[in-house]
């Protein structure tokens, strides 16, 4: 359970005492019985996170001290909050230090800055419960309740309310970051969205620049732009009182290739026509899940889950109209879900994030791409061909097409580091399996699948009329591998596009020694 407190603020620029002495945080080394517990708190069994030392922190001062100790000891620094990264950015340095942020999960209101404060170790589930039950507000974050805000917000953050309220970073007022200067001195800096703030560029870099780049984020302050007054209930979005939903399903046996093309075109057309910032259709969020075909077909091989804001008949009518459009000419089995309270739908009683500790997925690989419009017919055929011949060793092979756009697209691309501001869908490609002996074959299948979908643009979603790069919160080191990215477009342009040069300048200013680095980290400007 998150720790909810009253007002508090850490002094800006707090500095740890220099030297190699042990910091105040708990230091956990191999051989300590706590080490194995910390090492296993990752979400992907493909990766090993066995550093020289874990530092379990409980305050900004302890983070400053832990970073200073690592710098003075010459050890690489990694940061982990929820441990959901799709790549092994945290475990890249076996001789390094992993700073574990899960002990910093307080949520409170700061009256001086008129903003709600979230510590980095707070899970989305804790945030949703606390914000809503305390003040009746929320943030438009993701569905996985065990994700911590530490990484989620830095990469942009989106979820079922984003079409109505934008990305999470669109509500970010301030961020506290422990940085290391050129002299090797660790200190905490608070940066805000105020244009006159001398640290404004550091705030901007955390509105989509991705985790592990500039320092250790300890706290976020959230307040919606233009929000007035000092009542927390008026400073962040209010979720709908209730949600109405439904599912629409097909078996692979129901959808030969021509029907699959029709379904995908229907789905894309609806999103292309209903994703402007002021469209009434933004009150609806849906996920189309396309699962790899198994030996035994399932009634839910292809499934659309939709939710709509609005009480009673209005929400149900929007979902029904959406299902009518998507199922035109292809049928499908439809089940409507009665209206229920918002928090109950978001966090059903049997879905508590504490039950998700440890490895959630087995062995896992993910890829992603933004879509400005639907896939071409050739891309749709590629998706069909790969999913209907998915190898049996995969526990799950799936493409997710998630509603996007709406208010997300009401923000200029350069206003935040999150640059993709005219897409209507996010595509995610996932594969999970259990046996480590299947690693090579499983990875190869997903990599070839993704490459073939984007074969016209060098195997990756190069920004053009259809694609718009990828999402840094779904990191994929293959984008930096010339064997899988033959486009000539570097990985950082797929994630950050025209914002990358500015991010490099921020990196040079705030992490000139490149203390915080991993396979997809931003490089300091020359």
Please report, for each region that a protein language model flagged, where it lies by residue.
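Loop/turn elements at helix/coil->beta-strand transitions in domains of secreted/extracellular proteins
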Residues: 23-25, 50, 72-77, 94-96, ...
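Glycine-/small-residue-rich beta-strand-loop submotif within the FAD-binding core of flavoenzymes
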Residues: 42-46, 61, 90-122, 160, ...
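Glycine-rich N-terminal segment of FAD-binding domains in flavoprotein oxidoreductases
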Residues: 32, 43-105
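Conserved oxyanion/phosphate-binding beta-strand-loop segments in alpha/beta enzyme cores
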Residues: 17-42
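TerminUS-proximal long segments
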Residues: 437, 450-526
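Structural signature of FAD isoalloxazine-binding scaffolds in flavoprotein oxidoreductases
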Residues: 56, 87-105, 161-181, 216-219, ...
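Hydrophobic, small-residue-rich alpha-helical packing segments that form membrane-like cores
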Residues: 107-112, 124-181, 188-189, 193
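C-terminal cap/substrate-recognition region of VAO/PCMH-type FAD-linked oxidoreductases
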Residues: 189-477, 484
């Amino acid at each position: 359970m998150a720790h909810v407190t009253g007002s508090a603020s850490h002094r800006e620029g707090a500095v740890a005492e220099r030297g190699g002495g042990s910091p105040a945080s708990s230091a956990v080394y191999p051989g300590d019985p706590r080490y194995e517990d910390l090492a296993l708190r990752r979400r992907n069994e493909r990766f090993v996170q066995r550093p020289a030392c874990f530092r379990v922190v409980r305050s900004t001062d302890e983070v400053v001290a832990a970073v200073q100790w690592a710098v003075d000891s010459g050890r690489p620094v990694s940061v982990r909050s929820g441990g959901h990264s799709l790549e092994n950015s945290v475990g890249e340095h076996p001789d390094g230090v992993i700073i574990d942020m899960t002990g910093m999960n307080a949520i409170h209101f700061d009256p001086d800055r008129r903003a709600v404060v979230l510590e980095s170790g707070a899970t989305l589930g804790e945030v949703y419960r606390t914000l809503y039950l305390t003040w009746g507000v929320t943030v438009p974050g993701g569905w996985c309740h065990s994700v911590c805000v530490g990484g989620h917000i830095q990469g942009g953050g989106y979820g079922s309310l984003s079409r109505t309220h934008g990305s999470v970073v669109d509500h970010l007022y301030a961020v506290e970051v422990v940085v290391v200067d050129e002299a090797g001195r660790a200190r905490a800096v608070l940066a805000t969205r105020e244009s006159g703030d001398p640290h404004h560029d550091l705030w901007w870099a955390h509105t989509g620049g991705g985790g592990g780049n500039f320092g250790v984020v300890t706290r976020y302050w959230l307040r919606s732009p233009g929000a007035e007054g000092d009542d927390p209930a008026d400073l962040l979005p209010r979720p709908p009182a209730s949600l109405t939903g439904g599912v629409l399903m097909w078996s692979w046996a129901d959808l030969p290739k021509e029907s699959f093309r029709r379904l995908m075109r229907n789905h894309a057309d609806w999103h292309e026509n209903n994703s402007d910032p002021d469209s009434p259709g933004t009150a609806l969020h849906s996920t189309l899940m396309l699962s790899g075909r198994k030996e035994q077909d399932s009634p839910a091989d292809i499934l659309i889950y939709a939710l709509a804001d609005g009480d009673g008949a209005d929400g149900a009518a929007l979902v029904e109209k959406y299902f009518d459009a998507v199922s035109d000419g292809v049928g499908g089995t439809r089940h409507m879900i009665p209206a229920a309270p918002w928090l109950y739908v978001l966090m059903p009683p049997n879905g508590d994030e504490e039950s998700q500790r440890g490895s959630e997925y087995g062995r896992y690989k993910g890829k992603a791409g933004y879509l400005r419009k639907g896939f071409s017919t050739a891309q749709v055929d590629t998706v069909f061909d790969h999913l209907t011949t998915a190898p049996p060793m995969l526990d799950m092979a799936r493409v997710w097409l998630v509603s996007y756009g709406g208010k997300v697209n009401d923000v200029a691309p350069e206003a935040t580091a999150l640059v993709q501001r005219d897409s209507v869908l996010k595509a995610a490609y996932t594969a999970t399996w259990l046996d480590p002996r299947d690693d090579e074959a499983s990875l190869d299948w997903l990599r070839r699948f993704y490459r073939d979908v984007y074969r016209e643009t060098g195997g990756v979603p190069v920004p053009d009329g259809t694609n718009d790069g990828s999402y840094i919160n779904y990191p994929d080191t293959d984008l930096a591998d010339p064997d899988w990215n033959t486009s000539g477009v570097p990985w950082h342009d797929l994630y950050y596009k025209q914002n990358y040069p500015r991010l490099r300048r921020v990196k040079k200013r705030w992490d000139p020694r490149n203390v915080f680095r991993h396979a997809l980290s931003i490089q300091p400007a020359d």
